[in-house]
Amino acid sequence: RKGQIGVLMSRKMIPTGITIEHIPERATLDITSAPRRLQVWIEVKDSDERARVEAERRVICEGESVGKNFVCIGTVEYEKNEFNHVQTFPINAAGTVTSKAVVRVWSNWGQEYTCLYRLRLHGEDKGPR
């Protein structure tokens, strides 16, 4: 594992996508710090809801959970050789409302460290936290 970042959102949402941005390959001498495989986890406090999300998702995440009440809802792979260095991926939260998310960088393209230039979580607004 290369790192993770937690997000405490100001509003509840149903996550629907994630955008990863890194410096373009054509603008750097070394692209190997770009993330490669990432996981998206959300907090689901209710145990019945957590079980439902786990049953409905079609995702297998590597490693241990990021926390007691978290479930993995997506894995994505950032492609360092793509012309577009801003890449958006759909994720399926199975309609679950959350206000906490964690993005785990599971691997990168070879460097000892990983750089994330911008990370955006997209979703359906469900009101104040």
Where are these regions (language model features)?
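Trp- and acidic/polar-enriched beta-sheet ligand-binding modules for extracellular glycan
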Residues: 1-4, 26-129
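A short beta-strand element within beta-rich, extracytoplasmic domains
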Residues: 11-28, 103
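Structural beta-strand segments of beta-rich domains
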Residues: 3-5, 14-15
